[in-house]
Amino acid sequence: MLMSRISYRRLDGILLLDKPAGISSNSALQVARRLLRAKKGGHTGSLDPLATGLLPLCFGEATKIAGLLLDSTKAYDADVLLGTTTTTDDAEGAVLLTRPVPTLDAEMVDALIPQLIGRIRQRAPIYSALKQGGEPLYAKARRGEVVNAPVREVEVHAIELLFLATPRLQLRVTCGSGTYIRSLVRDLGEILGCGAHINALRRRWVAPFQIPKMLTLDALEQALSAGRDPDSLLLPLVEGLAGFPALELDAQRLACFRLGQRLRDHSFQTGRVAVFSRDGIPAGLGEVDSEGLLVPQRLFNL
């Protein structure tokens, strides 16, 4: 018996997925892509399999801004278990060390948290997707090799203690790109002198989607089974450009921009800009230098 092949089509937009625990970000993307029958898709930075929450998925022309969302500010809620360190810095790893948890109160923890706020140096978990010698660190760790995880500078904007009842506490973290919450929790555990690991992690938002209306994979499947138009379940690409200054071009200049030509105008705002037609259709992203030269970077075919 021959099985019918799925017919994929062009689909442009952003799905705000509520990723479930126990599945990788790429697996979640592939499930959503099959359900939507989208030809082209990409995610905007991995969430650990243990983690849940917002995973923006970009389809079609929106994949051209996936890297920009990867660099966005993000917010998380972390459930932390004190007294135990693990190989992965979360509940999925093997226990490395167990230590007694000191008597703590919120005032004591709040007094120590500022050590982890601002521009800080952070060692990545050895079980992470960071590459070393062209290979993810986790692949080396799984083979039992000694992994020297890199130390990188990251930015943590805020950490709020939401709950404390030792040996558990809950944190709300707002941070910049590249920050590992597992590393942050591990380092807090060392500051407290007892060690710690993440028991559960949820990503609340990714800029510019600070109040996201997320869909689970089950809800997505149900909506499509009920006959919903796939396009109606996605945000338009323009929603992902909200963090950039908008620059409108007239038809003549827009035609040049779409051909990849550079444009000069001292009235242009310096920095990265989202370029639009006069009728509000996004044409691409560009960079304006100090001389007012607009250099096309990503062009949209909408």
UniProtKB/Swiss-Prot annotation:
Keywords linked to the UniProt accession: Isomerase, tRNA processing
Isomerase in keyword set: yes
Biological-process GO terms, alphabetical: mRNA pseudouridine synthesis; tRNA pseudouridine synthesis
Pfam families in the record: TruB-C_2 (PF09157), TruB_C_2 (PF16198), TruB_N (PF01509)
Enzyme class, broadest EC rank: isomerase
GO molecular function, one term: tRNA pseudouridine(55) synthase activity
Domain of life: Bacteria
Catalyses which reaction(s): uridine(55) in tRNA = pseudouridine(55) in tRNA
NCBIfam families assigned to the protein according to its UniProt record, in alphabetical order: TruB
Protein name according to UniProt: tRNA pseudouridine synthase B
Organism annotation: Xylella fastidiosa (strain Temecula1 / ATCC 700964)
Species lineage: Bacteria, Pseudomonadati, Pseudomonadota, Gammaproteobacteria, Lysobacterales
